[in-house]
Every structure is written in structure tokens, then in C-alpha cells.
Amino acid sequence: MKHRVVGRRLDRTTEHRTAMLRNMVTSLLRHERIVTTTPKAKELKRFADKVITLAKRGSAHHRRLANREVKDVEVLNKLFDSIAGRFKARPGGYTRIVRVGRRAGDNADMSVIELVDRAAAEAEGGEEKAEQKTEKKAAKAKEPKAAKAPKKAAAKPKAKAEKKGAEE
């Protein structure tokens, strides 16, 4: 019976399952969007929401607790500095699961799990990136193009032909 048993086993041992979820939450926070199977995404949603809630509290104690789950220092800093600030007003539900169909190899049900405010964060960052791209294009247009260097590949077939002629 499964009375009062919470969570999924995902056909893994306890150690493997916790290691997998820690790696997945680190990837989710780094990229803010990952593609995985639907059962894994549902478990990851529970796990990631708990880690983000720790980051929202923001104390040194909560940073240490989150450090047990997030295995990369850069991602941990990103979590506490930027991601937690974006979710200050939201009481929960920090991730979204979108089903994307079935995997070709084994017909597994696949889903995208992403942070809810990812689109808003990309819009703010996207405007800055667009400005940077236009600046780079303008700088490239101003620079004169250099003359191309002569190719060495044309000399190689002649050398091979000479060697063959010398051998015969």
C-alpha cells in the first residue's frame, strides 16, 4: 500500500535519485529551462520549489541548506542574487511544466520544465543583448576587410605528384 508515501522512485536507488535531482536542479537554475521526462519533471518541480524558497529567505543558514542541494557555487550565487529577487512577491509555484510530446527512441513522455518568470527576464536581458549585437554589427561594418592570405592547399597536390614521379 502507498498510504502516506510521497514522491516517485523513478526506478532508481535513493542515492541515485537524490544525486540526479541535485544535478537536475543545478541545471535548471543555470539554464532556467531543461527538457526531461515528465515523471522526472514532476519530481524536480517539488525539489526546485523548495530550493527557491530557501533562497528567498536569504539568511546564511538557508544558503548553507541550499548549498547541500545546488552543487555549483556560481549557480548558488545566481540563485540567491537574481532568481530569489525575481520571486520575492510570488508565494510559490516557481516552475512550469509544459509537455512537448514523446521521445523518438523509447516513446517516453517528454516535458520542458522552466522557471515561470523566464520570459520576463529574457525580455529585459534580450533588449540589452539586441543593443550589443547592433553595436557589434556597426563596429564590423566600419572596419575594412583585410586581404585573404594565399592558400597552402594548392601546393600540396603538386608536391605529392612530384613524389610519385620520383618513386617510379
UniProtKB/Swiss-Prot annotation:
Comp. bias (Basic residues): 148-158
InterPro entries: Ribosomal_bL17, Ribosomal_bL17_CS, Ribosomal_bL17_sf
Region described as Disordered: 121-168
One annotated GO molecular function: structural constituent of ribosome
Basic and acidic residues: bias regions: 121-146, 159-168
DNA damage keyword on record: no
Keywords on record: Ribonucleoprotein, Ribosomal protein
Any one of the GO BP annotations: translation
Pfam families for the chain: Ribosomal_L17
GO CC annotation: cytosolic large ribosomal subunit
Family: Belongs to the bacterial ribosomal protein bL17 family.
Oligomeric form and interacting partners: Part of the 50S ribosomal subunit. Contacts protein L32.
Name of the molecule in the record: Large ribosomal subunit protein bL17
Gene that encodes it: rplQ
